[in-house]
Amino acid sequence: MNKEMTVNGKSYTIIKLLGKGKGGYSYLAESGNNRYVLKQIHHEPCDYYQFGNKLEAEIRDYRKLKEIGIKMPVMLETDVENERILKEFIEGDTIYQLVLEDKMKTDYIEQLHRMCALLYAANTNIDYFPTNFVVHNEEIYYVDFECNDYMEEWNFENWGVKYWSKTPEFLQYVK
């Protein structure tokens, strides 16, 4: 890939696409000896989700989750003009990869339950899909910044947990 993108005038080399979400594309980026996640907001339609200003929403959600105490990468910079966010890169496998490779540990689910206790007390849900969580030094990090008002239907116990092991829902997604 190796193309360049800038954040507030500073250039970053794009190493690879890490993933595409409802709000944007996340790339592994490099500058000097440091690695980052560079997220480019996109405006592609999403059938099941309505957005206002995506960049403002990311900033607002990041601040809210930080205040709640959720373990996640640091938002280092925002580039309003180019609709880009520079985040700390958390090295490690996603929960999705660990489930796929039969390397999941019950401790990761226990850590998520502790995270949920903080979230639910703040009337908040996050996107519990396993690609949004990275394990680094045996600790889970929520690497997406999306959050919403709490709805029981979309909490971890009723929705997210279906994708944290090789359930029919997980296996259907893999196809």
Q: What kind of region is each of these model predictions?
A:
Residues 111-118:
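Conserved hydrophobic core/spine positions of the Hanks-type protein kinase catalytic domain
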Residues 128-133:
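Hydrophobic residue at the +6 position relative to the catalytic HRD Asp in the kinase catalytic loop
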Residues 121-125, 136-175:
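C-lobe/activation-segment region of protein kinase-like
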Residues 50-68:
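The N-lobe alphaC helix and its flanking beta3-alphaC-beta4 segment of protein kinase-like domains
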Residues 1-15:
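Juxta-kinase regulatory segment immediately upstream of eukaryotic protein kinase catalytic domains
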